[in-house]
A protein has these predicted regions:
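Terminal domain-initiation and capping elements
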Residues: 2-100
Length: 100
């Protein structure tokens, strides 16, 4: 009976995926309650943390709500936007690269 030999090669050039900031933009129509709901539902924040982030969005005009790999950030942005539109809110979300 022969024995198979396993050869392990190091992976060269593997990089971390680029990280992107998900930014909520304040508007005069999307309710604070709806924003809090999206932060809890889509980003798993507690209600208290979501409320604090929502206050920042309201006060500063925008706020970073998460930093995630590009594909995940893009999908979250799409999901939240679709949810907002289906509830007749104009919530705007943008993605920006996280600079290191």
């Amino acid at each position: 009976m022969s024995h198979a030999e396993t050869i392990t090669k190091p992976i060269i050039g593997l990089q971390e995926p680029p990280m992107f900031k998900i930014i909520y933009i304040n508007d005069n129509q999307t309710t604070m309650e709806f924003v809090i709901d999206t932060l809890v539902s889509f980003f798993n924040y507690t209600t208290e943390t979501a409320f604090e982030i929502t206050k920042d969005i309201h006060t500063d005009g925008s706020a970073v709500v998460a930093v995630l790999p590009y594909e995940v950030a893009e999908q979250k942005g799409i999901e939240v936007t679709v949810h907002a539109r289906s509830n007749n809110f104009p919530l705007q979300i943008k993605l920006e690269p996280e600079l290191v």
